[in-house]
Amino acid sequence: MKSYFCVTPTGCLKTHTRPRIVPKHSKKCLRTYSRPRSSLSDSEGWCVVLPRDGGGRKRKADGSQGRPSNNPGRPSRKWTEKTIAAPPQGFFSRRDNGYWVPKSPEKKYVPKNLPRNMDGKKTYKDALTSPAKIQIKPTPESILLAQKIQNSTFKSRGKVTLSQTSLPLVNRFQELQLNTLLEPVEESTPFGVNDKRAQHLFCKKVERKVGRTTMLVCPITGTESHIDVKRGISARIVDSMASVVHTDKLPEYERGHVVIKNVSRTKRVCTPVPFIGTFSDRAIRVECDDHTDELASASSVPSIWKPSKKQHAVPISSSNEMGSAVGTKPDWYTPVKTCTHRQYQKVQRVFLDAMNIMRTLRFHIGPRELRETWVKCWLQVHKKNVAFPGWMITPLLSGTVPCAQEFFLPLAGENRGFVTVCQA
């Protein structure tokens, strides 16, 4: 037997044999250590751990006997499969048998026939909760798709209806740009269901170690991605379907080779990971001539959103239609007010919704229509004269439905030109 020292009231050290740590299996004694025999002297200082509710109170074998508990119906905790929310005082109290039933809250009386606002018009809240209406060319699969989108979580933040024939362009500069940059693109083969070319859009890459190198691998297909873990990515969008080709592979792509990596080493069995696009949330200032921001007092608006002249969507080389560089401000340039944070969020939300819808439609319409729809859809959001910040206008000019990588947004003070190359 191991022995240990214990200090007795007399103050001298004595050696004792250690008491049994495992209690005898009986309902009577719930203490952790067995009590020392009283036939030994009582002055010895054993460390005896008693149950919380004080010494020798014998528990009834059955929770249902004894005093009635706090709970109506007295369910004993033993027989419930429910997960029980713990009360603040902790579980087992003496009066309810380790069971606690949360009170059901009383319902407030709200008359149903009263409209929320007195005019009975649709409110902002209604717009949030009603599904977006989307109109696309009625081919059978597009009808199914539209139903799917309407039942899904896209709610109309601002109504974005995709079919509209004439839309006012925002200003002459953008009209010029759109005319020059959106030339028709032929797509060699339409996208299939699990198309290799769209992998970067619908599967989350998982880090795999092969030897010393860490690489990102798509868990569904087992293909390596064009993202290098250390250097980040540099890839170019090659067609209107937002297909991405790694810049190292571009010459081979131009020569018409199919760009593939050697994957056989990295193939593993694993479960697919669903991927929902991520957007970085850097602070961006959006210019707008909306007057609602005058309601916000200067103190309530954080300093990042205070007006600044920098973020206008101005092309990198300021030149007029003739191509000669001019020093003066071009005629479409007018200073515009800066949005509040809330307005900016509203714009961004509409934008992302539209983008998600477009991305879903990618497999169902031809690239040309898709691109036109995208541009229309996005321009419709801004009926007012708005100077887009670069990150919003880029996808328009590049003629692609944007890929997530296009959304590495500019830093607070930064001016970013129009780029079609995704750089992360």
Curated annotation (Swiss-Prot):
Pfam families found in the cross-reference section: SatRNA_48 (PF17485)
Top-level taxon of the source organism: Viruses
InterPro entries named in the record: SatRNA_48
Region Disordered: start-end pairs: 51-83
Protein family according to the UniProt entry: Belongs to the nepovirus satellite RNA 48 kDa protein family.
Protein name per its UniProtKB record: Satellite RNA 48 kDa protein
Taxonomic source organism: Tomato black ring virus (strain L) (TBRV)
